UniProtKB/Swiss-Prot annotation:
Keywords: DNA-binding, Metal-binding, Nucleus, Repeat, Transcription, Transcription regulation, Zinc, Zinc-finger. This is Zinc finger protein 678. GO terms for molecular function: DNA-binding transcription factor activity, RNA polymerase II-specific; RNA polymerase II cis-regulatory region sequence-specific DNA binding; zinc ion binding. A zinc finger (C2H2-type) spans 97-119, 125-147, 153-175, 181-203, 209-231, 237-259, 265-287, 293-315, 321-343, 349-371, 377-399, 405-427, 433-455, 461-483, 489-511. Pfam families: zf-C2H2, zf-C2H2_6, zf-H2C2_2. InterPro entries: Znf_C2H2_sf, Znf_C2H2_type. The gene is ZNF678.
Length: 525
């Protein structure tokens, strides 16, 4: 008879009193097997004394079915014996349908048909809503739920609903803590098989999905799909609230939390909440002290991979972010974004207390501490507190004596980078800070600020003792010594003290015999 798929037509009994379960079992077992595989030749003769071939229409199938007059069945070879044979055969499921293209075997012809579409690229199931095509009907059914918003699968534990059964199954593992998939290489466990598969590629180094545009390779096909959107500029995920679009669905999900204020990720250690899981993961390292990302060049370790990537640019000198306006390059994207505001004049961050605006959010945060008086950065050495971390870093160098910034021109060292930058202008002669009033130029911004007070006659520094005001802070400091009696500048020859360095310098000339400087205009001393 060959391997034609036949089924005993138990639904066409003539007066047979046979259970529904038996008919289901016969249909299930026989559907993918030849009759000879199931029943011995003698049993076939005993069973099929009266047989007719008919097309079975009630199930909507095109298979030919044997219809038996059950009145002739030998009582000694009844349902039980054949049920046992059929159950045994159904459980073994010989894979008799083979793919000619790749040699893979399947138990069902329908599965083979679906499989063949991988090789042919055929996608016969089309979404009427958006035109997207699929190689499986089930995938189209799942896809349609995106348009309808249908989420038929609900979690009994927390009430969360899902489009797909597989999503619910995976979600349940959050509640149970089940991680059934273990890596043989490092014993790490995972909730999902796909996570384990992706993880294994870390050990093998396999990246089977290359980008045809730039050659970059990926461990997962989904990562390649997302990456391609960099080249195409495609942003298929749009926020209904503000219309902002994203190239990743996860980015849209995270963005939505700005509108909802949702922060679903909570730190068990301190109770701090976050709107992204990755932010919680990074935060936890504060408690654990873990720094898993280490620089091979200098050994410095970081809590975040992004921080390591940025740090590496110090060694390589790489500055991949360029300003289109002036051509200046930066090693961080955030630095470029801040820099661009110099050209646009944009200051999007406003202080609600005084109305002052800033180009950077970090500058606003620091500024707010002027109003609150908050000084969160404390020196362990002397207890002095600061409102900026950079100020604490600079202060620490007083105790350590470290001066990490060296001038390549003259070898002079400085505690602060800004001091080195100002110093370099002595060698270059650069004076970038110009007075609009008189045109005089200066190499430091602070010197220009002091100079401007000559024109404005502003004297912002007032003595609390006598009320006298000064245009420079250093002048007020010197003046205060009159009230305190402090004379910090002493003559080494006679021990006489002075409260000003300039007076001390003039006095020293008595012993040195040095002529005092004459005035260039009138010639007087």
């Amino acid at each position: 008879m060959g391997t034609i798929s036949l089924c005993i037509g138990v639904c066409a009994f003539e007066g047979a009193n046979t259970s529904t379960s038996f008919y289901k079992l016969v249909y299930t077992a026989i559907l993918s097997y030849s009759i000879q595989d199931l029943l011995p030749e003698q049993d076939m003769k005993d069973l099929c004394q009266k047989v007719t071939l008919t097309r079975h229409r009630s199930w909507g199938l095109d298979n030919l079915h044997l219809v038996k007059d059950w009145r002739t069945v030998n009582e000694g070879k009844g349902q039980k014996e054949y049920c046992n044979r059929l159950t045994q055969c159904s459980s073994t499921k010989s894979k008799i349908f083979q793919c000619i293209e790749c040699g893979r075997n399947f138990s069902w012809r329908s599965i083979l048909t679906e499989h063949k579409r991988i090789h042919t690229g055929e996608k016969p199931y089309k979404c009427e809503e958006c035109g997207k095509v699929f190689n499986r009907c089930s995938n189209l059914t799942k896809h349609k739920r995106i348009h309808t918003g249908e989420k038929p699968y609900k979690c009994d534990e927390c009430g969360k609903v899902f489009n797909w059964w597989s999503q619910l199954t995976n979600h349940k593992k959050i509640h149970t803590g089940e991680k059934p998939y273990k890596c043989d290489e490092c014993d790490k466990v995972f909730n999902w098989w796909s996570q384990l598969t992706s993880h294994k590629k870390i050990h093998s180094g396999e990246k089977p999905y290359p980008c045809e545009e730039c050659g970059k390779a990926f461990t997962q096909f989904s990562n390649l799909t997302q990456h391609k959107r960099i080249h195409t500029g495609e942003k298929p995920y749009k926020c209904k609230e503000c219309c902002k679009a994203f190239n990743k669905f996860s980015n849209l999900t995270q963005h939505k939390r700005i509108h909802t204020g949702e922060k679903p990720y909570k730190c068990e250690e301190c109770g701090n909440v976050f709107n992204e899981c990755s932010h919680l993961t990074r935060h936890r390292r504060i408690h654990t002290g873990e720094k898993p990302y280490k620089c091979e060049e200098c050994g410095k370790a970081f809590t975040q991979f992004a921080s390591l990537t940025r740090h590496k640019r110090i060694h390589t000198g790489e500055k991949p972010y360029q300003c289109e306006e002036c051509g200046k390059t930066f090693n961080r994207c955030s630095h470029l974004s801040s820099h661009k505001r110099i050209h646009t004049g944009e200051k999007p961050y406003k202080c609600e207390e005084c109305g002052r605006t800033f180009t950077q959010f970090s500058n606003l945060t620091q500024h707010k501490r002027i109003h609150t008086g908050e000084k969160p950065y404390k020196c362990k050495e002397c207890g002095k507190a600061f409102n900026k971390f950079s100020s604490l870093t600079q202060h620490r160098r007083i105790h350590t004596g470290v001066k990490p910034y060296k001038c390549e021109e003259c070898g002079k060292v400085f505690k602060q980078c800004s001091h080195l930058t100002s110093h370099k202008r002595i060698h270059t002669g650069e004076k970038p800070y110009k007075c609009k009033e008189c045109g005089k130029a200066f190499y430091q911004s602070s010197i220009l600020s002091k100079h401007k007070r000559i024109h404005t006659e502003e004297k912002p520094y007032k003595c609390e003792e006598c009320g006298k005001a000064f245009n420079q802070f250093s002048s007020l400091t010197r003046h205060k010594r009159i009230h305190t009696g402090e004379k910090r500048y002493k003559c080494k020859e006679c021990g006489k003290g002075f409260y000003q360095s300039s007076i001390h310098s003039k006095y020293k000339r008595i012993y040195t015999g040095e002529e005092p400087d004459k005035c260039k205009k009138c010639g007087s001393l």
